[in-house]
Amino acid sequence: LRSRGLGDVYKRQLPYLESIRQLKWELGKNALCVHLTYVPYLAAAGELKTKPTQHSVKELQSVGIQPDILVLRAEHPLSDGLRKKVAQFCNVDDKAVVQSIDAETIYEVPILMQAQGLDSTILEKMGLPIGETPGLGPWRKFLERRHAAETKEPINIALVGKYDLQDAYKSIREALSQAGTYNDRKVEVHFVNSEKLTDENVGEALKGMAGVMIGPG
């Protein structure tokens, strides 16, 4: 659940919130509610604001849902004092407040989450045995390989599609990026609007491309 819009589209969300409440009631400790919220940074004041998170949790509590874990999405690191404040006012354990700050790539997020003990906290709350901390060796090797690939000469790939919103093709872009990692090359994806392509300009539009991919739609 995201804190953004919880009150704005409250009526539309009620059926989903009620389903979560009932599921948590039926499964008890066999279910966890992990609430992802955004902690905005006010540049003028130079501080992070936790009020939106507090209000969001209170909205959930008002419909019978108590988050077990809070993941705070922020652009800057949260101090221990700020995290403790969130834990106190949102009625969760200190160690159940995890920050998710901006990372160089999304693939670093699991490493950052593990470093804060999120995996152990989940296992503990669900009454599951906590073994040795996994080293995540294959994942770390992938990250090392990805960083190394970023230093190589790029391969240019044209992604032809009709949607201007780049996120519409995010899965394709990520797939191409991962393919580049496993081939030790940096892949640069260039979006080409299919509706603006003509017989006259297609040659220039695709000039210098090592490959062309046609997006769905």
Report the location of each language-model feature.
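Short beta-strand segments enriched in small/hydrophobic residues
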Residues: 153-163
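Single conserved hydrophobic/aromatic residue that forms the stacking wall/gate
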Residues: 1-10
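Internal gly/pro-rich beta-alpha loop/helix module
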Residues: 24, 31-130, 139-147
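Flexible gly/pro-rich beta->alpha loop and the following alpha-helix that scaffold active-site loops
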Residues: 173, 177-217
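Glycine- and acidic-residue-enriched helix-capping/strand-helix junction motifs
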Residues: 49-50, 163-180
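A short, charged/proline- and glycine-enriched loop
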Residues: 150-155, 186
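His/Asp/Glu-rich metal-coordinating catalytic cores
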Residues: 12-13, 17-21
